Amino acid sequence: RIFFAFIWIIGRVLLWIYRVDVKGLENLPKHSVLLCPNHSTDLDPVLIGLCLPLDYHLHFMAKAELFDNRALAWLIRTLGAFPVQRDGKDIQSIKTAMQVLHKGENLLIFPEGTTIRGGVGYHDGLPAHAHAGIAMIGVRTGATLVPVFCDGQKKPFHKTRIIFGEPYVPEVTGRRGTSEELQAIADEMLRQAYA
């Protein structure tokens, strides 16, 4: 935790360099929160994490390839990351995500599943698509979902906005909801992130 605190302090200086304008932190509950940001660059989870209080206990999924480098794997694990295979069949990462939320800690998952290209809200020129898995994790754990907007201007001295939206606890049919309900929840989180 000492190393993490050191990184966090250095990171807060970087927020000033990147001119990050943060709004909506008052919207965040303290426990079992599932942050649902749009995904514009690889720096998004780091910038969002640095906006939060030091004791917020944020975890996030990171593509498994990043863990191939031992030094990088150690660093991102220290920052709260755990690996996910992005073929959509990684049961272990889903279990880990649910364990994080059941423990009362907080989790960041990108509804789009990957960084976007082609403009805000678009991926390769097509409208961004939300994956229903984020809603499934939220519903099964009873987590509070919070949409987050990152504007993607990650150049030094160019203003960047990070906006935390209103918290949302989804209501579904039964304990798990239908596939249509879960997709609608995921779509709504992404829509609110871009609103």
Predicted features along the sequence, with ranges:
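Non-catalytic C-terminal accessory region of glycerolipid acyltransferases
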Residues: 93-195
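Glycine-rich, highly charged phosphate/nucleotide-binding loops
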Residues: 17-21, 88-93
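Short, basic, glycine/proline-bearing loop/turn elements
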Residues: 10, 78-85, 117-122
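Flexible, charged surface loops at secondary-structure boundaries
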Residues: 27-31, 101-102
